Amino acid sequence: SGGFDFSFLPQPPQEKAVGLGPGPMGLMGPRGPPGASGAPGPQGFQGPAGEPGEPGQTGPAGARGPAGPPGKAGGVVGPQGARGFPGTPGLPGFKGIRGHNGLDGLKGEPGAPGENGTPGQTGARGLPGERGRVGAPGPAGRGSDGSVGPVGPAGPIGSAGPPGFPGAPGPKGELGPVGNTGPAGPAGPRGEQGLPGVSGPVGPPGNPGANGLTGAKGAAGLPGVAGAPGLPGPRGIPGPVGASGATGARGLVGEPGPAGSKGESGGKGEPGSAGPQGPPGSSGEEGKRGPNGEGSTGPTGPPGLRGGPGSRGLPGADGRAGVIGLAGARGASGPAGVRGPSGDTGRPGEPGLMGARGLPGSPGNVGPAGKEGPVGLPGIDGRPGPIGPAGARGEAGNIGFPGPKGPAGDPGKGNRGAPGPDGNNGAQGPPGLQGVQGGKGEQGPAGPPGFQGLPGPAGTTGEAGKPGERGPGEFGLPGPAGPRGERGPPGESGAVGPSGAIGSRGPSGPPGPDGNKGEPGVVGAPGTAGPAGSGGLPGERGAAGIPGGKGEKGETGLRGEVGTTGRDGARGAPGAVGAPGPAGATGDRGEAGAAGPAGPAGPRGSPGERGEVGPAGPNGFAGPAGAAGQPGAKGERGTKGPKGENGIVGPTGPVGSAGPAGPNGPAGPAGSRGDGGPPGVTGFPGAAGRTGPPGPSGITGPPGPPGAAGKEGLRGPRGDQGPVGRGETGAGGPPGFTGEKGPSGEPGTAGPPGTAGPQGLLGAPGILGLPGSRGERGLPGVAGAVGEPGPLGISGPPGARGGKHGNRGEPGPVGSVGPVGALGPRGPSGPQGIRGDKGEPGEKGPRGLPGLKGHNGLQGLPGLAGQHGDQGSPGPVGPAGPRGPAGPSGPPGKDGRTGHPGAVGPAGIRGSQGSQGPSGPAGPPGPPGPPGASGGGYDFGYEGDFYRA
């Protein structure tokens, strides 16, 4: 009933009873006082193993005990070390001459087993073992009189005690026996193609084989791989600058008309369409990163609620204008893009406020006279009279239509006019059409190495280790498995490993928000245009100036209608071919493309003559660098040293070669997230990784069409002669009919023996005649010609049965042997007989000489690609491997497509007004606008040139 049997324990000695019968049972007296505690009894025998009790509740977590001493290195042989990084591929050797096919060598004996590798490093500390079982109950106590007290009821299960202190590390385990050799692992990845071997010596010429039959012509080979695209040719020499066009005749100034009344202000016009996009400007150099600030990083607070957008602050005071940088030398002009179609002309905007009248500039030099214009129409008054005195200057008339643009004059040297008031910002026009992408710029020098990136997020929790071996219980009996203990605190951070190689450049960060628009600069008075100078030689590119603040983004205007596409201009003459440029760096080899579907077999062509062996081709591209190997074994945790003082920041030294990857230390506690650093410089694209393991085999596709018959190979050696069959004798055919005997012919000359006629049926035996007397031997007559067999006669009726045969006569003399007759024609084949029993195998003949190795057959067309198998479940995330060395710099990639415009960020702090940059080059003249309404503005002009405000 769940109790224990203590009958095996020693019982107290019983006093000998008197031989009387049992008396009556007395009344039970009152319970006496408890006796004094007796001396502790001797140690009882170990009781039987108790039944396992119910698992106790998990007690509160005890205080963290002191760190135990580091465990001793275990003697278990560690796993096989990770595969080392692949060495740099050697230069491919020269292609050797193809030697004759040698004889197959004998199979070699298997090599001796390799030596055991060095034992691996100590593995990580295992999880604590299972909880021991409840021990057996102790011996029963004894009273003062030595009697065994009654066994009390089972007490309630006590609460679990506090967790015990970690035990001392166990003794060093002994080195276990050498395990059995494991099964052969899966085939490793295909090794890299070795260098071609040295050509072997030319073997002796073989025996000339028999001329084989001419084989059928093989199918046409697959088309070769397309060669790599050639290097881009050098840039052509720019052509000469075209001559300036002829200057048109200057229009006649009409007489000034009366001043009209000032009209009402027109409504705000719709924004005009944007002009064609200008060529892209040169990229500025990236600024240097400032020094890191001091101070320790505080703990990361909880993320606050996102506040609403604050009110826009007052614009700050304008900062001091920065120093204008030196004007950079003009870079090389990029190829001119194709001019986009002209958009529809937008309505003119509202006229701005008229600025203060500027001081008149000094008159410029007189430009060269243009060609004489056409003769105007004769005036109403006939021939002009003599010139009278100059009258008073009349009012300015309306501005006539603009005449053709004359050549630019020299720039005026007058003082700069006073700045006019700021005009209102016009509405922003619609975005212009995207210009043609400019030519690819030259690759700049490699930038400085980027700063070390922020530490990545903590990896996923690794799988729990296997439980340790069950330890001995207190009383030698293993207890039941207790609940799994809580995960221990993370260990201390290991010693910092050596700095890894510089990582690849990270992706460019998103563009920051646009700053506030600076105040517009003072608009100067328009100077007179000078003559166009000859195009100078392009100067060297100077350092980029300090970029000015970016203005606020205006409201998006209405998009104008798309204009009609203009006709393409005439194609210019091709420029002179420049000298070839230096060869570019060798790019990485691209991945092999997927095999295309098998095409139909082409027609069989005529065999061409074998060409001469060409020269050895250039060396191929170097293969891609292999992927990083498996992570190394975990190193032992070093002691944490004291933090040193911050030293003086020295100059940046040269980038050293990548050192060996150190072992990964134990995972430290997750630190607080630091402030976001500036986006790192985009690194160079890394080398293509090694091809992954082959995926599961797809479903076998339908068989492809049969390929063309390959060329017939050389005739192989003759095989051993098979056993000779012994057929059974076929059944005899039916006997033929007996022909009639023809008349005896005259003996003629001996002709060739004729073909034997069919055997006739045996006639009925004739009447037995009497034996005649033996005649004399006559002379042999001349053999007559064998007559043709006559037609088969009708078989006569069977004759009467004759008597018995007479006595056999004596044999006649043997005649002379006649001449051998000619071989008659082959008779018809008889019916096939029954197959005879298999004969005994004959003796094995001698082995024939090995035949020459046949040519390799043409490679069959690739079969249809099988269906793609289902994607397997993702495996567990492995530990991060060591950072591999930086791969070689790949070729510059093609310019990517223009990304979608990002969302407009919040308005930044208004920047200080930048200094006025140098004047940009004059843009192309825009299309003439429609004539505006005649307003009542102020008219002023100089030397007959009128301007209307």
Swiss-Prot record:
The modification 4-hydroxyproline is found at residues 10, 13, 34, 40, 348, 351. Residues 1-949 are annotated as: Disordered. Prolines at the third position of the tripeptide repeating unit (G-X-Y) are hydroxylated in some or all of the chains. Residues 634-643, 835-846 have a biased composition (Basic and acidic residues). Pfam families: Collagen. GO terms for cellular component: extracellular matrix; extracellular space. Residues 921-931 have a biased composition (Pro residues). Residues 27-66, 147-162, 208-229, 273-283, 377-396, 490-507, 519-529, 562-606, 613-633, 651-661, 682-691, 737-771, 779-792, 810-825 have a biased composition (Low complexity). Keywords: Extinct organism protein, Extracellular matrix, Glycoprotein, Hydroxylation, Secreted. It is found in: Secreted; Secreted, Extracellular space; Secreted, Extracellular space, Extracellular matrix. It comes from the Eukaryota. The modification 5-hydroxylysine is found at residue 95. Trimers of one alpha 2(I) and two alpha 1(I) chains. Interacts (via C-terminus) with TMEM131 (via PapD-L domain); the interaction is direct and is involved in assembly and TRAPPIII ER-to-Golgi transport complex-dependent secretion of collagen. These protein fragments were extracted from an ancient mandible bone collected in Haiti. This is Collagen alpha-2(I) chain.
